[in-house]
Every structure is written in C-alpha cells, then in structure tokens.
Amino acid sequence: MDIKRIGSQPSGRGPPDWFTGTVRIDPLFKASDPARVAGASVTFEPGARTAWHTHPLGQTLIVTAGCGWAQRQGGTIEEIKPGDVVWFPPGEK
C-alpha cells in the first residue's frame, strides 16, 4: 500500500506548450508497473485552456469545481460542471 498525502508532491505551472493562460498542476499519483494510470488535479484560471492534443490510451476528466467547456476537434462545445466525467478515447483531439 502506498498513501500519497495531500500536498506531499510539488505543484507546478502548466507549461505554455500545453496550455494557454494560467494553469496549476498538482500531481496526485503516477503509474506504478504494471498499471498505466496516473492522476493529477489541474486547476484552470478563468480564460485558461488546453492546447489541442491526444492521449494514446485516452483520458478521463473529472470536474471537481467550477465550470468549463469540453470539445472534440470539429465537434460541439459542451459545458461541463462539477460531478461530470468526460472520456476522450485514444487518439481523439
């Protein structure tokens, strides 16, 4: 068993090649073999957004506070709110 205590890992600013605006990334856990899952709490200041990108194994977003928008490239912009879970399949922008 491995317990990661809140605040035990350093926060970082989201890199400008990944994000527009001010974004804070708080790592929660990294994948330990044989697992492939990692998690982070990502906080977006108003107006901040993610650059178009893909994840080879897909990505799950869990909205914990605030509201925002999610969109697949070329798709409809969807409003997301606390409690919503968004799944992006592998390779989808």
Predicted features by range, described:
Residues 1-37:
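A short, N-terminal "cap"/entry segment at the start of jelly-roll beta-barrel domains
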Residues 4-5, 38, 74, 83-84:
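Short, charged low-complexity linear motifs
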Residues 9, 16, 42, 61-63, ...:
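Short, flexible coil/turn micro-motifs enriched in small/turn-prone residues
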Residues 11-12, 45, 80-81:
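Intrinsically disordered, low-complexity regions enriched in Ser/Pro/Gly/Gln/His and often acidic
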Residues 24-27, 38-55:
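Conserved short histidine dyad/triad with adjacent acidic residue
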Residues 27-29, 43, 71, 79:
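Generic structural detector for well-ordered beta-strands
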Residues 33-35, 44-47, 67-69:
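Short, charged/polar surface micro-motifs in flexible loops or helix N-caps
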Residues 49, 54-82, 89-92:
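A short beta-strand-loop-beta hairpin characteristic of the jelly-roll/cupin
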